Amino acid sequence: MVRELLEKARGLSMFTAYNTNVDAIVYLNGETVQRLIDEFGAEAVKRRMEEYPREINEPLDFVARLVHALKTGKPMAVPLVNEELQAWFDSHFKYDVERMGGQAGIIANLLANLDFREVLVYTPHLAKRQAEMFVKKPNLFYPVVEGGKLVLKHPWEAYRENDPVKVNRIFEFRAGTTFRLGNETITVPFSGRFIVSARFESIRIYTEPELKPFLPEIGQRVDGAILSGYQGIKLRYSDGKDANYYLREAKKDILLLKREKDVKVHLEFASIQNRELRKKVIYNLFPLVDSVGMDEAEIAYVLSALGYDKLAERIFTYNRIEDTVLGGKILIDEMNLELLQIHTIYYIMYIAHANNPLSEAELRQSLELATTLAASRASLGDIASPDQISVGMNVPYNERGEYVKLRFEEAKRRLRTKEYKLVIIPTRLVQNPVSTVGLGDTISTGAFTSYLAMLKEKGEL
């Protein structure tokens, strides 16, 4: 079933934007973590952990947030705002791998490797180092304007010499890694990653003015669009521009994509630490898109920004399925979304309105494809061809699968769900993943494209 659905999805033409970067990856071990703690002293690290810095301005901020992530075993991303710290990172770590990062870049490479009919990727910054991170596939294109016309080139032929490059440093950690923090011995409970995301003035999220008039043509050409990277917008810039300016432009982009035909747009949401900015992104963009994807921490952040602080706190503290379902219902109604997809370590969930053209069984198939693709990626580190989905098909569902289904049925009984289609599936969980980077993006891509493929088959696209 999964294979047939992927086959249908591969007939689609997709557009993805905006964020790409170079991911410099470090595979952490206990000794490296210990060395960092010893360099600053356990007491200083503990004090800074209590302060919980929201961004990285100096090395101790980094060490404190890293140790916190390792202790909880939760994947986290913290912005690096001090460009001068790049040299400190480069002197302290040897990068094990350099590869494509940023949601739009990861999604573009995935779709190209899965042999989708046509993949258009746009990022406002395309330096040579960045362009070389794209897979060399004939179905992958970058839109440029030449002679007043839209021209599609392969990304590695469209780079611009003087564009800035964004480097995100990713620290992959494994469950079972141990180190000492003063008198305490810490064992990492889950595998995950800690991302130090570069948030510098030079990197912006926008569409170049000369390409903007051609967005309706792109929207007409494709079956769907996946937009991401809004977490990279800053509240204020030194040149006088601010988040409001870039969000106004982002709204124009979505409306232009939808001008000639109402192309379905999925927004892949990522954690935004600043509450004010988070609120702006939600209120400006969510009402314009059809589908949103996020993880359970992100839905708590979103609910908190919408004023549902108690519910957000419950999701953060207890992680109960019924709270996530309740939060999802609130979000889909307040933002008038067609589809909300929430992915966690143990389950993936869809929430749609009852009048959605797809049945709950079809929505479930879409999620099955999503978790199978993610399991293939976790097992192999990347997906190089459509055949590799068979790897994910051999990965068992996680051990909490039955418990997840039970709690979901309880939640449905307890909450009013008649006006909704609610679907949940347990994830296929790889015990020792080669990499955890891009798994959420892979889930959202598999889910949204298979959703579109089934809509198309019903004549609803």
UniProtKB/Swiss-Prot annotation:
Pathway: Carbohydrate degradation; glycolysis
Domain ADPK: residue ranges: 1-457
Enzyme Commission code(s) on record: 2.7.1.146
UniProt-listed Gene3D superfamilies: 3.30.1110.20, 3.40.1190.20
Biological process terms in GO annotation: carbohydrate metabolic process; fructose metabolic process; glycolytic process
Reactions listed under catalytic activity: beta-D-fructose 6-phosphate + ADP = beta-D-fructose 1,6-bisphosphate + AMP + H(+)
GO CC aspect terms: cytoplasm
Key words of the record: Cytoplasm, Glycolysis, Kinase, Magnesium, Metal-binding, Transferase
Role, per record: Catalyzes the phosphorylation of fructose 6-phosphate to fructose 1,6-bisphosphate using ADP as the phosphate donor.
Protein name: ADP-specific phosphofructokinase
Organism of this sequence: Thermococcus kodakarensis (strain ATCC BAA-918 / JCM 12380 / KOD1) (Pyrococcus kodakaraensis (strain KOD1))
Gene this chain is encoded by: pfkC
